[in-house]
Design a protein with these regions (language model features):
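Conserved protein kinase catalytic core
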Residues: 7, 137, 172
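A short alpha/beta connector and helix-capping loop motif
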Residues: 172-204
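Residues that line or immediately flank small-molecule/substrate-binding pockets and catalytic motifs
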Residues: 2, 91, 196
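Short, glycine/acidic-enriched loop or turn micro-motifs at the edges of active sites
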Residues: 169
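Glycine-rich, proline-tolerant flexible connector loops at the mouths of alpha/beta enzymes
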Residues: 1-20
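Active-site acidic/histidine proton-transfer and metal-coordination neighborhood
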Residues: 14-158, 162
C-alpha cells in the first residue's frame, strides 16, 4: 500500500492528505481489514536520484514533507480502522559506482528520518519502521539504508519506530531463522515482509 492514489486529481506527494485515502478506508472497513502504509520514495521527478539522503536541500525537504504527510495518513488509517498501521520507510537511495563519501548520505538520511518522526503520532497505533536492503539495480555499490543503519536507528529510537525484516534483503549467508530470534532478544515487536510464492520468485520468500 504505497502513497499513490487515483481520484481524478493531481496532488504531489508532499501535499497528500488523509482525505485522498478515504476510498482505501471504505474498502478495508467493508472487509474488516486493517491497512499498513508505505511512503513512496521513488518514481518521481524529485528523485535526483537520491531522496531522503540528497545533498540538495530542496529535494530532501520535499521528501521529508512526504514522509510527514504519510505519518498523518497512517494515523488516520489506524484511527478509522481500529487497528495498528505499520508505516514502512524504505528508499532506493544509493550509488551504482563506489562513492568517495559513505558517511555523509547516511547522516542526511538519519536527519531526514528524525524530521519525519517528529510529526506527532500515537506510537500505540502507528508503528514506523526502517527497511534496509543489501543492494539493487542502480545501487550495486552502496545502499544508504543498510542493515546496520536500519537496526541501529531502531535501537536508538525506541518509542518512535520498530525494526523491519524484509526476508530477502540479506547477504547470501544470512538466514531469517537467526535474524528474527536475535532481534526478539532486544525488541518486543518487529515487522516482517514475507511472501508465499506461487509460480514466481520474490525477495521476501521464507521456508515454512
Amino acid at each position: 500500500s504505497y502513497a499513490i492514489f487515483e481520484d481524478g486529481e493531481f496532488v504531489d506527494r508532499d501535499k497528500i492528505e488523509p482525505k485522498h485515502f478515504k476510498k482505501w478506508v471504505e474498502f478495508a472497513k467493508e472487509r474488516g481489514m486493517g491497512l499498513d502504509f508505505n511512503p513512496t520514495f521513488f518514481s518521481h521527478p524529485k528523485c535526483d536520484p537520491l531522496t531522503l539522503s540528497s545533498p540538495n536541500e530542496e529535494t530532501r525537504h520535499f521528501w521529508v514533507e512526504h514522509g510527514k504527510a504519510c505519518a498523518r495518513i497512517s494515523q488516520y488509517l489506524a484511527e478509522e480502522l481500529g487497528q495498528i498501521c505499520t508505516m514502512n520507510i524504505w528508499t532506493g537511495d544509493g550509488f551504482k559506482d563506489i562513492p568517495a563519501d559513505r558517511l555523509g548520505p547516511r547522516l542526511r538520511y538519519k536527519q531526514s528520518i528524525d524530521e519525519i518522526l517528529s510529526e506527532p503520532f500515537d506510537f500505540n497505533k502507528v508503528k514506523p519502521c526502517i527497511e534496509s536492503k543489501v543492494f539493487g539495480i542502480g545501487v550495486e555499490s552502496y545502499t544508504v539504508g543498510s542493515a546496520e543503519f536500519a537496526l541501529n536507528y531502531a535501537a536508538m529510537n525506541r518509542g518512535k519506530c520498530i525494526p523491519l525484516m524484509d526476508n530477502g534483503h540479506y547477504h547470501p549467508t544470512e538466514v531469517v531463522s537467526d535474524k528474527i530470534p536475535a532481534l526478539l532478544s532486544f525488541f518486543s515487536e518487529i515487522a516482517l515482509h514475507i511472501t508465499r510464492p506461487v509460480r514466481w520468485d520474490s525477495d521476501h520468500v521464507v521456508l515454512f
